A protein has these predicted regions:
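Residue-level detector of Asp-centered blade-edge/turn motifs that repeat once per structural unit
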Residues: 3-7, 49-50, 106-107, 154-156
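Short loop/turn segments immediately following the C-termini of beta-strands
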Residues: 15, 59, 69, 116-117, ...
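Structural signal for beta-propeller blades
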Residues: 18-20, 62-65, 119-121, 167-169
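Short loop/turn segments immediately following beta-strands, especially the blade-tip
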Residues: 21-28, 66-76, 124-132, 172-182
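Asp-box/WD-like beta-propeller blade repeats and closely related beta-sheet repeat scaffolds
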Residues: 31-101
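Acidic, glycine-rich loop-and-beta core segments that form the ion-binding/anion-interacting portion
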Residues: 138-184
């Protein structure tokens, strides 16, 4: 689930898409609408800094999906969807892409897609004029590290792996992610 930037709407994953609910003063939820994401069920949601897009991570199909959102809370059309390709290094993950987490950088310039299956973080630019995700960089994580979640704060960017290590940077610009160092 994810909450809109204004706190009025709750986004949720459904079998083949995403739904949005309006939160009333009592905390009750009323469904507004839903959209199909043209892929398998997502596993992680986030919104951009401006609240104009909903990002969906697809673990089962390795897909990153972007959905337009409207000021009145409605979900709009699909902006773009990108399937990751490649082979991973851990047999238990079936050697294929599994997008675990999608989150925009704090400056809203890039979308980071953490892929547990292929040990990578793909960094996209959201081209709002062309309605496309454009791959601008790839952070290749150590083999079998299983990156899971990326998180940002004002001072630190964290990339969390399969419960055994964390990569940390004092830089908030993910384009400098290559300078991350592994901490055990």
């Amino acid at each position: 689930m994810a909450v809109s930037k204004n706190g009025k709407y709750l986004y949720s994953i459904e079998d083949e898409g995403v739904a949005v609910f309006k939160r009333d003063k009592n905390g009750d939820l009323s469904r507004i609408n839903s959209v199909n994401i043209d892929g398998m069920r997502g596993c992680f949601l986030s919104t951009d800094v401006d609240g104009k897009y909903l990002y969906v991570a697809g673990y089962h199909d390795g897909k990153v999906t972007v959905v337009h959102t409207h000021k009145d809370g409605r979900l709009g059309s699909l902006m773009d969807g990108v399937f990751h390709t490649g082979l991973g290094s851990v047999a238990e993950r079936n050697f294929r892409p599994h997008v675990n987490c999608v989150r925009p950088t704090p400056d809203n310039k890039y979308l980071c897609a953490v892929d547990n299956g292929i040990d990578q973080v793909k960094i996209y630019r959201v081209n709002k004029l062309r309605n496309k995700l454009e791959l601008v960089d790839i952070l290749r994580c150590p083999r079998e590290s299983g990156p899971r979640i990326i998180s940002f704060s004002m001072m630190v960017s964290l990339l969390i792996f399969s419960l055994n290590s964390v990569m940390r940077s004092g830089l908030t610009n993910m384009m400098e992610a290559v300078r991350f160092r592994r901490l055990n």
